[in-house]
Amino acid sequence: VDLERKDLSVIYFDNGPGYYTGLRIGFSVAQGICASLGIPLVPVNGLDALAFAAHTSHRKICSLIDIKRNEFAYCTYNPVPGGVVRNTDPEVISVDNLEIKITSDTEKKLLVGNWNLLNNKKIVNDSNTKLADPKFVTAEHIFNVGERLFDSDNYPNFNEIQIEYMREPDVTLPKENLVKKVNFYD
């Protein structure tokens, strides 16, 4: 990329939910660049970015991001002129619970995000649910939401930014490894 310092005034980044390694690497790189250049870092929730990018004027929007282990991050939104408003807080949901939630809701809805990874005919064939793009969060989606957050000065302080993992990692250290004493003279 042919950029100069004067070309960069802010960085927007996807702070989750998503896969651990990608989120950590993206956050670390963004932090390093912003800290070294003294520019703001604006986190954007991936579920929000998907909903904002969805094209609907009347359907409820359901955003879905795969977070592994047959679980998804899920959140619902209402379309409003010029954007979307969250209906619910983001949650971790299994495919079985998502099926119940989607099929029992008689409201017309748009399902965006990783619905193509669902191996569930009841969800994808639900008569009140329209499967739509975007299927993945893109840099353009992050930019569109991040720009609004930045322009309205609605983002956290650099030191308060956190990644939204939404669940525990796949790999953890055994508790006994964390409580052993270290002998530096061995």
Language-model features and meaning:
Residues 132-186:
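Acyltransferase
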Residues 10-41:
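DPxDG-like acidic metal-binding loop motif
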Residues 28, 49, 141-145:
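Short amphipathic alpha-helical face segments that pack within enzyme cores
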Residues 40-137, 165:
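Surface "functional belts" at beta-alpha junctions
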Residues 1-7:
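Helix-rich "cap/lid" substructures immediately adjacent to catalytic or cofactor-binding pockets
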Residues 31, 35, 56, 148:
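Short, well-ordered alpha-helices that flank and scaffold nucleotide-derived cofactor binding pockets
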Residues 7-10, 109, 161:
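Residue-level recognition of the N-termini of beta-strands and the immediately preceding loop/turn
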